[in-house]
Amino acid sequence: PGQFLTLMFKQLTDQGLHFQQASVIGLSRHKSGIEATLSGGNRVSAKQVIIAAGAYSRDLARMAGDRIPLQAERGYHLEFDLDQPLLSRPVSASSRGFYMTPMQGRLRVAGTVELGGLNPKASRHRLYKLQQGTNYYFPHLKQANRSWLGFRPSIPDSRPVISASKYGNDIVYAFGHGHIGMTLAPITAELVYALLTSTTPPIDLNDYSAGRF
């Protein structure tokens, strides 16, 4: 995924994308469009805004006027550096609740579900369980070279929010895809485009509306 995203980012910047990394601490509507207040005091204006910040989208949606029961579902990762690959494809250790995925020069082990909010502190016992499960299949592997946790954006009914805000399509939502955000990214982009341009989407979006809660 890293190489793909790097290439996609380069393609977009070559086409004129302006990238700015900052925290959004406020959203306000004006006759000319939406104004976002960024950390540091800078302000950015746009006619339309897409909120697609994954597990961090709930507070942004609230600024836009919608209360959406988005929760952060914490998932854990280990990586083992390898001279030779151990697997030729992703493998699910379903009885132990994790996946093993071959990467360039390494094996990534990821899984578990923990409803622990956006707290960045890892639960060490979950990392231990992943290490223990990996060693069940590959006893020769030593301690993982890297570990981290990530936040999956989860919605109680397991459907993402792909919707205009309740005040109009000047703000459009695209989040809550759980474990399959990259998988659903292409069709989500097509649906978001339809919402932004007020054209007919390829599927009925009522089940994905922010107003269903």
PLM region descriptions:
Residues 1-40, 44-47:
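Helical element adjacent to the flavin cofactor pocket in flavoenzyme catalytic cores
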Residues 1-10, 121-126, 183:
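Short beta-strand to alpha-helix junction loop
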Residues 1-10, 112-115, 169, 175-177:
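Helix-loop-beta segment of a Rossmann-like dinucleotide-binding subdomain
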Residues 2, 54-55, 186:
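Alpha-helix N-cap/helix-start capping motif
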Residues 20, 50, 172-174:
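Hydrophobic/aromatic beta-strand patches that form the interior of the parallel beta-sheet core
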Residues 21-24, 144, 204-210:
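Beta-strand segments within the central parallel beta-sheet cores of soluble alpha/beta enzyme folds
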Residues 26, 33-36, 43-44, 48-169:
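Active-site substrate-recognition segment that forms the wall
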Residues 34, 166-213:
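C-terminal lid/capping helical subdomain adjacent to the catalytic/cofactor pocket in oxidative enzymes
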